[in-house]
UniProtKB/Swiss-Prot annotation:
InterPro entries associated with the record: POC5 (IPR033351)
Lineage, highest ranks first: Eukaryota, Metazoa, Chordata, Craniata, Vertebrata
Modified residues (Phosphothreonine): 23
Name of the protein in its database record: Centrosomal protein POC5
Alphabetical keyword list: Acetylation, Cell cycle, Coiled coil, Cytoplasm, Cytoskeleton, Phosphoprotein, Repeat
Record localization: Cytoplasm, Cytoskeleton, Microtubule organizing center, Centrosome; Cytoplasm, Cytoskeleton, Microtubule organizing center, Centrosome, Centriole
């Protein structure tokens, strides 16, 4: 494709140059004829363009015009007009691509063939016009000169164009040959590569064919060996089938003999068992019965011995429990007596101390009670006490209280805390007396008495004797550690067990008071007896006998 395009471009270039020369020559020839056949009046004007046209030829053919110096000057003057005419002819002529040599011959042959006809027609017209108008000899001479110059220029132009075309054709031919050689080399290289690839492929195919031949030969040998093996296996299995059949027949005969013998043995064994089973069953039943009787007798003897032993231990335990219960009752009675004696002593000592001061307080509280009434809904709020906790069930059944001096001590202890508390707003020091009494009792036939409320008594320093401080604290210690007792009941206050001893401690007087102590004396803490009572646990109940316990804490601050 590239070579065809180069050819077309080269042909177009040659054709353009060829067409420009032929068209220029033909146009000049027509102008000469036009100026040669004119009227006499126009001869002078026609002669000047002919000279100008004659001056163009030496410009194009310098080799021929170089002998005449006059023509050289004329050619220099006529260069501009000739260039304009040639440019006009080039732009007006059409361009047709063709081979340069064929274009040259075809254009000139056609030009030569057309030029005589045009000359003949023009000569005829000239003759006709000449008959009418006279033509001078000078004009004929000029025309002859111009025609000579034109023919010589045409010859030189044709020869130069032919030489150019020849050179161009040779160059084009060389280029085409070079391109064709390059293409040929590329094609040869491609073909050589293909040949080498095909040779390698041929070698690979030969190798694969050889391998396939080897595989085929190996398979054929393996198939032959397999056929031989199959034939051997067929013969072997035929022999084996016959051998197995013969052994099977022998084994079936043995099985039949064994089955026959077993059936005979079963029949014999069933007959023997039916005979022997009756006697054996009776013997076994007698033996089992005798053994069971012996075991039952032995078990009954063992259980009787164990029962007697356990009943004796139970009696001993009951006697010990009763003895311990009696000791406990005696110990509790002695403890109550000792405790009440101590309480009575403390109460008497406290009453002697506060005898003079308490009379006014008791009278004051009695007046308040009478004013509020026995069934009054509330107390005076000035008594700095928590009324919700001022009452406590402290009643004790009358039949449970001890007789004699114990009863008197209990009566005095229960009557003393019932006094109302008194406070003095202007006092800087305060003394308080807290006497909580709790008596808990348990009895199966005892009926509870009506409850009596009490409140802690607060006595100010104005009601006491100056310079005397008595602080008493009673603590109890448990003498027995057993927690569970049978057939007894025990009432415990707080977390303290029944008291075995009473310890009274006296403290030195406190003379330095601080603001918190004064505030505490002014607003004493209310005791909630209900919160200090724990549930009593019943350890055993004895009808007609009750147990009671009282704990008292006294604190006097001067």
């Amino acid at each position: 494709m590239s070579s065809d395009e180069d050819k077309c471009s080269l042909h177009v270039a040659h054709n353009d140059s060829d067409r420009s020369v032929s068209t220029d020559l033909q146009e000049e020839y027509e102008e000469l004829l036009r100026y040669a056949i004119v009227n006499p009046n126009v001869e002078c004007s026609a002669s000047q363009p002919s000279h100008l046209r004659g001056e163009v030829a030496p410009d194009r053919f310098p080799t021929l015009a170089g002998n005449n110096p006059v023509r050289d000057t004329e050619l220099e003057v006529g260069k501009g007009s000739d260039l304009n005419i040639s440019s006009h002819s080039k732009s007006g002529s059409p361009r047709k691509p063709s081979h340069p040599v064929m274009d040259f011959f075809s254009s000139h042959v056609l030009g030569d063939s057309s030029s005589p006809a045009s000359l003949s027609t023009r000569t005829d017209a000239h003759e006709i016009n000449g008959g009418e108008h006279l033509v001078s000899d000078e004009n004929f001479q000029k025309l002859e000169n111009i025609l000579d110059i034109w023919s010589s220029g045409l010859k030189t132009n044709v020869l130069s164009e032919l030489s150019k075309w020849r050179l161009n054709f040779i160059d084009w031919h060389r280029m085409e040959m070079k391109k064709e050689k390059e293409k040929h080399a590329v094609v040869v290289k491609q073909l050589s590569n293909q040949i080498s690839d095909l040779k390698e492929l041929q070698k690979a195919f030969e190798i694969s064919i050889g391998r396939k031949d080897e595989v085929i030969s190996n398979l054929s040998r393996a198939i032959g060996k397999q056929k031989e093996r199959i034939e051997l296996m067929k013969s072997f299995f035929r022999w084996r089938i016959g051998h197995v059949k013969s052994r099977q027949e022998i084994y079936e005969g043995k099985l039949a003999d064994q089955y026959f013998q077993r059936t005979l043995l079963k029949k014999v064994w069933k007959g023997w068992r039916s005979v022997v089973q009756r006697q054996w069953k009776d013997v076994v039943e007698r033996a089992c019965q005798a053994r069971a009787e012996e075991v039952c007798v032995q078990i009954s003897n063992d259980y009787e011995a164990r029962l007697a032993m356990l009943s004796g231990a139970l009696e001993n335990a009951k006697a010990e429990i009763q003895k311990m219960q009696q000791e406990k009752d005696h110990f509790e009675d002695s403890m109550k007596k000792a405790f009440m004696r101590g309480v009575c002593a403390l109460n008497l000592e406290a009453m002697t101390i506060f005898q003079n001061k308490n009379e006014a307080g008791i009278d004051f509280t009695n007046n308040k009670k009478e004013e509020s009434g026995p069934g009054g809904p509330g107390r005076e709020p000035s008594a700095h006490l928590d009324t919700s906790s001022s009452t406590m069930p402290s009643a004790v059944p009358s039949q449970l209280l001890p007789s004699g001096p114990l009863a008197a001590g209990v009566a005095s202890a229960t009557a003393f805390p019932s006094a109302a508390s008194l406070t003095s707003a202007g006092a800087t020091s305060a003394s308080s007396l807290h006497v909580p009494i709790s008596i808990l009792s348990a009895g199966s036939a005892a009926a509870p008495a009506p409850e009596e409320s009490y409140a802690p008594r607060v006595v100010t320093a104005a009601q006491q004797k100056a310079g005397k401080t008595i602080t008493a604290r009673i603590t109890g210690r448990s003498d027995f550690g057993s927690k569970a007792r049978i057939n007894s009941s025990l009432a415990i206050m707080g977390v303290s067990p029944p008291m075995g001893s009473v310890v009274v401690e006296k403290h030195h007087p406190v003379t330095v008071q601080t603001i918190p102590q004064a505030t505490a004396a002014k607003y004493p803490r209310t005791i909630h007896p209900e919160s200090s009572i724990s549930a009593s646990r019943s350890l055993g109940a004895r009808p007609g006998h009750a147990q009671s316990l009282s704990v008292q804490s006294i604190k006097v601050v001067d």
